């Protein structure tokens, strides 16, 4: 019996959302019970024995992964959302996109000062969204003790960007190219 790797469950869609882009679609991983289980287990493996107070997930696929990881750790989950999507008082961080700027927010009471947080998302590209999420968590007086991703796109430099911030970065697989 041949065992599939996490990478084998991820579909590539050519020219989406723009011509020349190879979109790494993790929804096929999420849809497969075995693949999804393998991914969650492997996201947790590097952190075995570590204590986390919260898991934070980046919108939107980071919510799916982060919720499952938080469940496995028996800890709380904190969504980091696009501006205007959270109902309570928030803090925000803006970051640069290829063409313009984006803003992410978190509730100002979602994480208590001094808590240890694991940041989770599906894909690490340039690292801009993850960096903004880390800054939000740090503004609340907390420590990001790890950043876990299913896919790393190393050609876009996100891992280097986060490691330059002193972050420990873990990805289950990498895809070269755009």
UniProtKB/Swiss-Prot annotation:
Gene Ontology cellular component list: cytoplasm
Disulfide links within the chain: none
Any one GO BP annotation for this protein: AMP salvage
Secretion signal, residue range per the UniProt entry: none
Keyword Glycosyltransferase: yes
Pathway: Purine metabolism; AMP biosynthesis via salvage pathway; AMP from adenine: step 1/1
Keyword Glycosyltransferase applies: yes
Catalytically driven reaction(s): AMP + diphosphate = 5-phospho-alpha-D-ribose 1-diphosphate + adenine
Entry's Gene Ontology molecular function annotations: adenine binding; adenine phosphoribosyltransferase activity; AMP binding
Keywords: Cytoplasm, Glycosyltransferase, Purine salvage, Transferase
SUPFAM superfamilies: PRTase-like
Subcellular localization: Cytoplasm
Enzyme Commission number: 2.4.2.7
Enzyme superclass (EC): transferase
UniProt-listed InterPro entries: Ade_phspho_trans, PRibTrfase_dom, PRTase-like, UPRTase/APRTase
Reported function: Catalyzes a salvage reaction resulting in the formation of AMP, that is energically less costly than de novo synthesis.
Similarity section: Belongs to the purine/pyrimidine phosphoribosyltransferase family.
Quaternary structure (record): Homodimer.
Name the UniProt record assigns to this protein: Adenine phosphoribosyltransferase
Provenance organism: Cereibacter sphaeroides (strain ATCC 17029 / ATH 2.4.9) (Rhodobacter sphaeroides)
């Amino acid at each position: 019996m041949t065992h599939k790797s996490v990478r084998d469950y991820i579909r590539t869609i050519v020219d989406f959302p723009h011509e020349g882009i190879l979109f790494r679609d993790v929804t096929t991983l999420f849809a497969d019970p075995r693949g999804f289980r393998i991914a969650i287990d492997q996201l947790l493996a590097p952190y075995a024995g570590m204590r986390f107070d919260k898991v934070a997930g980046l919108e939107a696929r980071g919510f799916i992964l982060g919720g499952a990881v938080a469940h496995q750790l028996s800890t709380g989950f904190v969504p980091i959302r696009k501006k205007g999507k959270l109902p309570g008082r928030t803090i925000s961080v803006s970051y640069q996109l290829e063409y313009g700027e984006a803003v992410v927010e978190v509730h100002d009471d979602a994480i208590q000062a001094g808590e240890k947080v694991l940041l989770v998302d599906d894909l690490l590209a340039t690292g801009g969204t993850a960096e903004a999420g880390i800054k939000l968590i740090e503004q609340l007086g907390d420590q990001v003790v790890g950043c876990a991703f299913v896919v790393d796109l190393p050609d876009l430099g996100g891992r280097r960007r986060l490691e330059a911030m002193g972050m420990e970065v873990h990805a289950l697989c990498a895809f070269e190219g755009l």
